């Protein structure tokens, strides 16, 4: 089957969790599945910007991105984080090829506005061409995508990694989209992890401010993927990534399965 795995930046920064995620991704590919990885790196980007004397600001979980922040994102996401993940997957025994959404015109972006507000070089995916991803699969490789894409103006745009993962899953007609995150799953008002969550329930939780911050774009991406034909979407804690190879074989007790309604 075709599986897109989005790995959060926090998981990549922790050495033990990174190894666990990389081993699971490699094992999926070794089992004959077509696997693509999309990654974030928000914490590392925030840390680098802080070292450069820049403060990070967010609107609904999306980073306000001026030109300097965008260039730093290219360095951190397209460089350091991407190559770190590639190295980990290859250490687990599978060839991995790192690139960003702008390479090969794989993804095109347009400027994204939130509540009418211009966030700078923040984009949303408006076009996807998965031919290079499929070419890597044909050669037995694992594509590793950084969440940056080119606009029609020739500028790079910072794209929310959850949104890019959803677009990648839809473009590749993926059977499954899995988010490996630094949280145990989606929590209800009482703080308990919800094993199942419909997109309708997610909208209600967002309206009631039960979910906020980075979980908002993640759940929007889940809904986007399901609406565009992706069969299954699940949010899993990256610390339990070893369950990934059993995804189709057994019922998982961790994380949240998101369904369309």
Where do the PLM segments sit?
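C-terminal catalytic "cap/lid" subdomain
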Residues: 1-261
